[in-house]
């Protein structure tokens, strides 16, 4: 290879740095979106758990014992 022009090296370095910064920004944006969606999903799951517990209470189902659901009317 012939001599490398310092200006060309500086230009290439600048382009690579810009590209890396753009990639980092995109990854950060995606990461923030994913975390936001996970937080939203967590809230929805909490709401679902509460709704299920409320429905079980309304249906007369008490706490689960082991893996079997025992309705309040069948408990001894």
UniProtKB/Swiss-Prot annotation:
> Which PANTHER family does UniProt cross-reference here?
HEAT SHOCK FACTOR BINDING PROTEIN 1, HEAT SHOCK FACTOR-BINDING PROTEIN 1
- Mind telling me which GO cellular component terms the entry cites? axon cytoplasm; cytosol; nucleus
Q: What's the main place this protein lives?
A: nucleus
The protein's superkingdom reads: Eukaryota
Entry's transmembrane regions: none
The entry describes its oligomerization and partners as: Homohexamer. Associates with heptad repeats of HSF1 trimers and probably also HSF1 monomers, and with HSP70. Association with HSF1 trimers and HSP70 coincides with attenuation of heat shock response and the conversion of HSF1 trimer to monomer.
Is Nucleus one of the keywords UniProt gives this record?
Answer: yes
A GO BP annotation: axonal transport of mitochondrion
Q: What is this protein called?
A: Heat shock factor-binding protein 1
What's in the keyword line of the UniProt record? Nucleus
One of the entry's Gene Ontology molecular-function terms is: identical protein binding
The record's family statement is:
Belongs to the HSBP1 family.
Q: Gene3D superfamilies this protein is in?
A: 1.20.5.430
Q: Where in the cell is it found?
A: Nucleus
The task this protein performs is described as:
Negative regulator of the heat shock response. Negatively affects HSF1 DNA-binding activity. May have a role in the suppression of the activation of the stress response during the aging process.
InterPro entries named among the record's database cross-references = HS1-bd
